[in-house]
Amino acid sequence: MDTLAVVSQSGQTLNLFDPTSGLRTGQITDLIAEPHELCFDNRTGFLYISHTYQHGWYTSHGAFVSLISVFDSKTRIVVDTIEISPYLGPHYLQIDKERDLLYASVEGGIAGETPEGGGIVGIDLHTRLVTKRIASGHKSHWFVMTPDGSKAYTCNKEAGFVSVIDLITERLLRTIAMPGGCEQPGISRDGSFAFFPSPAIGQVGYNPYIKVIDTRLDIISQSIPLETGAVTVHVDSRDRLLVGLYRIEVDKISSKPIPSYGGVACFQPIGPSYERTGTVETGLVPLTITSHPDGSRAYVSNIFSGTLSIVDMTTMTVMKVLEVDTDRRKDKAMHQGAHGIALM
């Protein structure tokens, strides 16, 4: 039976649900502060949990963490912790099954504790030791990897460029200019195209697009216009682009920026182009999206709502809304109640 795992960053919990009924089947509390992303290895049943900062978010956080937790989905126990020091702030995780490597984007430590010290580290899944480290030229928050495990494309947030990394030879191949920066990318099933939502949150003066990178030429081959900002792109088993949309407005009383909308737009590949086929409203800022292997459903974590939306991809409607963590903790400056997702 499938299990849907969702992290509450500010709640420091791993929440387990039956994805069909929507019922909560378990909760692991008191995770290391603060959990961010999830990556499931279906060969071993291990779920890897990244811990990026002790508290806070990308632009305002406490001390970096250098840990990745190992959760056994069979026993439902955290069985180990991977220490990656001196590398700082592991965030996004991907597994190269052919080479038994866990890759993690990091925000520092490769070239010192500077904005330029980020990149990607590779962890041997047998020894759980870091065996690869490749500098990207900036803090790397997210990345995509080609299916053959040869290349990675890093999201460097506000830096204004994407880094192209050779994972085999462990070197930075080149950078691709992306004025305004970017957010969480996706990649086509065959690895031919990577999709970066741009600009990064907080960057003003840029129109929102999905920037499409041709990975054979390492150039931006087209731009898909959007009506509002996008924070993530997930490519499902039918090569549809599921784009997490957001809108931020200024509160009239406090004059602070607040999220006011979240939704998912679906783009269908039509020849070399993409046609928008539907949009559904979800919760506030749909930060992470994954999908069922058959493409029938999408799972959307709404970080500021603390909920997870299950979307019927045939009708583009929300089937269920699961409460992951909707209670704001007084000791947290920002409520981040639903972040990383994994379908186990």
Which role does the model predict for each range below?
Residues M1-M344:
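Predominantly soluble domains enriched in secretory-pathway, periplasmic, or organellar proteins
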